[in-house]
Amino acid sequence: IDCETYNLCLNFCHNVAWQISMISTDGTYKKDERDFYIKWDTPFKISDDAKRITRYNESFVNKNGKEPKDVFPIIKKWLDGADYIVGHNIIGFDIYLIKEMYKMFGEDYKHLVPKLIDTNCIARGIKMEIPYKPEEDFTEYQYRIVNTRRKGVRSSLTALGKEFNIDHDYDKLHNAIVDLELNLKVWNKLKYALEL
């Protein structure tokens, strides 16, 4: 799952996701996808910089976007039914907005947390030489890594894709579905470094 948002705030009092995309896989290959643009009744404005980076198109979202109440049941069904939920920086960002969406509809999100696999955390752990040990809790490991800072550790999706020589259209990143397609390729490189 990946969310494109108005800004980097981690809750709905200042931010919402205007695009939420999901890819279903067999562990290696894409089987299905959902790509939602969401229209919110909100006073939030996206900055010109954020519009440029994410290619946010307000008229497109207004014309093609769905109401949150129409997309949440599908998102919930996919996430609740998933064995794992893989995302790049999902521990540090996306899960907070997913949590807010679950809360908005009176649902609990906590059962999702043990399913989270964050490719950013995995890559950072490898680069910082803090490997995951099978005897430790994987969720706790990821939270420890996301909160460990080291200079010079490059783990953005673009950096990892290029480091792994992955063929991808990098100019289209920050479209959630395009990000997920690259993240699946990155995951297919990183997963062999783990013993889950």
Regions found by a protein language model. Name each.
Residues 1-111, 149-164, 174:
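Conserved non-catalytic scaffold segment of RNase H-like nuclease domains
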Residues 3-5, 119, 180:
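Generic detector of well-ordered alpha-helical packing
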Residues 42-44, 122-125, 176-177:
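A short acidic, often aromatic-flanked loop/helix-cap motif at beta-alpha or helix-coil junctions
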Residues 100-105, 125, 129, 163, ...:
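Active-site catalytic microenvironments for nucleophilic, acid-base chemistry
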Residues 116-149:
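Short alpha-helix plus adjacent loop in nuclease-associated cores
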Residues 138-151, 161-165, 177-196:
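Acidic two-metal-ion nuclease catalytic site recognized across multiple nuclease folds
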